[in-house]
């Protein structure tokens, strides 16, 4: 039982570290995007490209 608790605690700790690192990386990426408006436009194009493709394929716009 003690080893199970120890393992779960270790997994929880590693998960918390992973989440905090991901948040820091995401925040850094957002700061970079604010600096470069062209990069923001590319993100929007990437997001809407599949929708436009589906619209053309199924012709339900």
UniProtKB/Swiss-Prot annotation:
Tissue distribution of the protein: Expressed by the skin glands.
Pfam families found in the cross-reference section: FSAP_sig_propep
Record-level GO BP terms: defense response to Gram-negative bacterium; defense response to Gram-positive bacterium
Propiece residue ranges: 23-45
Any Gene Ontology CC annotation: extracellular region
Domain of life: Eukaryota
Entries under InterPro entries matching the protein: Frog_antimicrobial_propeptide
Location in the cell: Secreted
Keyword Disulfide bond belongs to the record: yes
Family: Belongs to the frog skin active peptide (FSAP) family. Brevinin subfamily.
Protein purpose: Antimicrobial peptide. Has low activity against the Gram-positive bacterium S.aureus (MIC>100 uM) and the Gram-negative bacterium E.coli (MIC=25 uM). Lacks hemolytic activity against human erythrocytes.
Protein name: Japonicin-1CDYa
Native source organism of the sequence: Rana dybowskii (Dybovsky's frog)
């Amino acid at each position: 039982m003690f080893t199970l608790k120890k393992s779960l605690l270790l997994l929880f700790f590693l998960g918390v570290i992973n989440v905090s690192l991901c948040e820091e990386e995401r925040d850094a990426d957002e700061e970079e995007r604010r600096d470069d408006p062209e990069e923001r436009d590319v993100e929007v194009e990437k997001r809407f490209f599949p929708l436009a493709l589906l619209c053309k394929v199924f012709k339900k716009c």
